[in-house]
Amino acid sequence: MFLLLQLTLRQDEQGLAIDLFEQQDLNVDRSGRGSRSRFIENLRKHCGSEDGVIIRAGSSTDVTVGDIRATVGPVRLFSVDGGHTEMLTANDLALAAGALAEGGIVILDDHFNPYWPDVAAGLGRHIFVDRSPLRPFAITPGKVFLCAPEWSETWRDALIKAFPTAHEKHSEMYGAPVEILGLGRFSLRSEADRHVSQLKAYVKTRPALAAFARKVTGREE
């Protein structure tokens, strides 16, 4: 995601990458294995060079909103894909919310990933406990997009106009209107149906589990 965001930079802007990289002793949930050299290699390969990117190695818990604003100014697009615990996710979302420019967008990764349920808990904490100024406005495969409520309609309309064939439905999340978009062959509805089919097939191969499922649902099939 960072590489894509880097390609959207204006001439007077810089990107800021914050990652543990080789400091894996700080990776409390083992959610990634960063490599600074590989990151720079990918920047050179896909973005031309690492020029225009400020790289900070370390934990985001040691970063403040003031640090971010002093380094790159108000942020238009902020990707949250760091630690995957509830508290780390909430921390990173708070940094993003505080660093955003007017009309800025936060992109949260892995919210619906069943392997990382604490990411969803972190967003819930950020919104309801930390009283976030942000709300979701769009969902795509693997990601939730957030902005200030007064910008929601603007960005939802822009997404629908930009990707009319990807738009699947309108819904709500945490009381806020959201647009659901698939990407290419990744239709969220078809993905959900596929997972249900896989689950049913798995349950049928486990008689005890199948019996439990029938008891819980009251269904014989």
Question: Predicted segments — roles?
Answer:
Residues 1-218:
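S-adenosylmethionine/decaboxylated-SAM
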